[in-house]
């Protein structure tokens, strides 16, 4: 709501509060991260490698209906709150929880950890054929579907599932056309990369920098994409 205000004083105060909150949170992570990643630590937030274990696995058997997991890469919490307003006529939010990414937060490490349910070093040790080192050529996340399958098997979930990655408009339209097939699966995971690509373009392309000159404009641009996206149609 504050983004609608034209009071520069309020905006400056909010900016200072956000900066201070960022600094406090950074110090909090620095103090606690090494203990969070220990296997025997019980007092920790949900992290990348425990996300599916904590939030998805318990729900697989909750219903006869298929479970859909939608991952929008690089989506910030404030962007999610913008999207949520469009979804409220169709969905009821039961829980609005936050999970923490492992470090580093780059896709190669954090997203592989989500689907494997393991820390990167453990992925490399257990599944070397599914791990691409940083210095190696090639896509670093090309085996997410296979890693998801391995994690499901470790939890004894021998179910029919699908993994779908949407990188462009054509892939999104194709996925929308396959919805009747997806409804036959117990679990469907859908990864959308647009927001991540937009984030990178914001730093690399001048025209995107102009369109997303500040946080309000950036949220507006992302919201416009979502409103006209195949993802919104699917949901």
How would you describe each model-predicted region?
Residues 1-235:
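Feature captures the catalytic ectodomains and active-site-proximal regions of enzymes
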């Amino acid at each position: 709501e504050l983004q609608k205000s034209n009071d520069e004083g309020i905006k400056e105060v909010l900016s200072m509060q956000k900066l201070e909150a960022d600094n406090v949170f950074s110090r909090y992570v620095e103090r606690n991260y090494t203990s969070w990643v220990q296997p025997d630590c019980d007092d920790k937030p949900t992290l990348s490698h425990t996300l599916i274990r904590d939030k998805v696995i318990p729900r697989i058997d909750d219903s006869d209906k298929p479970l859909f997991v939608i991952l929008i890469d690089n989506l910030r919490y404030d962007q999610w709150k913008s999207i949520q307003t469009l979804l409220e006529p169709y969905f009821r939010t039961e829980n609005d929880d936050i999970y923490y990414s492992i470090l580093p937060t780059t896709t190669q490490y954090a997203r592989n950890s989500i689907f494997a349910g393991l820390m990167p070093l453990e992925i490399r040790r257990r599944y070397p054929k599914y791990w691409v080192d940083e210095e190696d050529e090639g896509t670093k996340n090309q085996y997410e579907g296979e890693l998801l399958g391995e994690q499901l098997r470790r939890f004894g979930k021998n179910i029919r599932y699908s993994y779908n990655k949407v990188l462009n408009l054509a892939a999104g339209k194709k996925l929308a056309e396959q919805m009747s097939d997806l409804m036959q699966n117990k679990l469907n995971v859908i990864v959308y990369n647009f927001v991540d690509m937009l984030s990178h373009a914001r730093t690399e392309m001048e025209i995107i920098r102009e369109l997303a000159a500040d946080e309000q404009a950036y949220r507006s641009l992302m919201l416009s994409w979502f409103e006209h996206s195949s993802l919104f149609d699917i949901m």
